Amino acid sequence: MAARLCCQLDPARDVLCLRPVGAESRGRPLPGPLGAIPPASPPVVPTDHGAHLSLRGLPVCAFSSAGPCALRFTSARRMETTVNAPGNLPKVLHKRTLGLSVMSTTDLEAYFKDCVFTEWEELGEEVRLKVFVLGGCRHKLVCPPAPCNFFTSA
């Protein structure tokens, strides 16, 4: 699997946004602006949502002509109840919501890359990614593994 996600902090909403930034699938790049942070409301997903592409573990809105929804880390409390979530991440996000200085934006982005995405990008493992986006995008996965049903329609 050769998918990459861009991790951006949106200071206006104080959320961390994840967006797919490229794909190796018949040489076609993902549509949508690569530098802009998506709007708060999810875009409408067209009928041709790109399910034929080889990417696994990304919601169908990743291939929308309007651009993908932000996969937002909005609920530290939700993550605290998740078995596989690293123990210090909910604390970091909770402190940020209280306005306490805990990590710089660069450090926070590096934390997500090192602890969340390395295994997913290099080995094709999506389990940890799905754990962290429980409170984010609600569109269905392109090819969800059998028991996983995190991205369900609203």
Swiss-Prot record:
Keyword 4Fe-4S attributed: no
Where is this gene product found?
Host cytoplasm; Host nucleus; Host mitochondrion
GO process terms (BP):
DNA-templated transcription; symbiont-mediated activation of host NF-kappaB cascade; symbiont-mediated arrest of host cell cycle during G2/M transition; viral genome replication
Could you list this entry's UniProt keywords, alphabetically sorted: Activation of host NF-kappa-B by virus, Activator, Apoptosis, Host cytoplasm, Host G2/M cell cycle arrest by virus, Host mitochondrion, Host nucleus, Host-virus interaction, Modulation of host cell cycle by virus, Transcription, Transcription regulation
One Pfam family, short name? X
The main place the protein resides is host cell
Q: Which residues does the annotated region (Mitochondrial targeting sequence) include? A: 68-117
> What is the recorded post-translational modification?
A fraction may be phosphorylated in insect cells and HepG2 cells, a human hepatoblastoma cell line. Phosphorylated in vitro by host protein kinase C or mitogen-activated protein kinase. N-acetylated in insect cells.
Q: GO CC annotations?
A: host cell mitochondrion; host cell nucleus
What protein family does this chain belong to? Belongs to the orthohepadnavirus protein X family.
Annotated HAMAP family: HBV_X
Description of how the protein assembles with itself and partners: May form homodimer. May interact with host CEBPA, CFLAR, CREB1, DDB1, E4F1, HBXIP, HSPD1/HSP60, NFKBIA, POLR2E and SMAD4. Interacts with host SMC5-SMC6 complex and induces its degradation. Interacts with host TRPC4AP; leading to prevent ubiquitination of TRPC4AP. Interacts with host PLSCR1; this interaction promotes ubiquitination and degradation of HBx and impairs HBx-mediated cell proliferation.
Provide the function of this protein. Multifunctional protein that plays a role in silencing host antiviral defenses and promoting viral transcription. Does not seem to be essential for HBV infection. May be directly involved in development of cirrhosis and liver cancer (hepatocellular carcinoma). Most of cytosolic activities involve modulation of cytosolic calcium. The effect on apoptosis is controversial depending on the cell types in which the studies have been conducted. May induce apoptosis by localizing in mitochondria and causing loss of mitochondrial membrane potential.
Q: Under what name is this protein listed?
A: Protein X
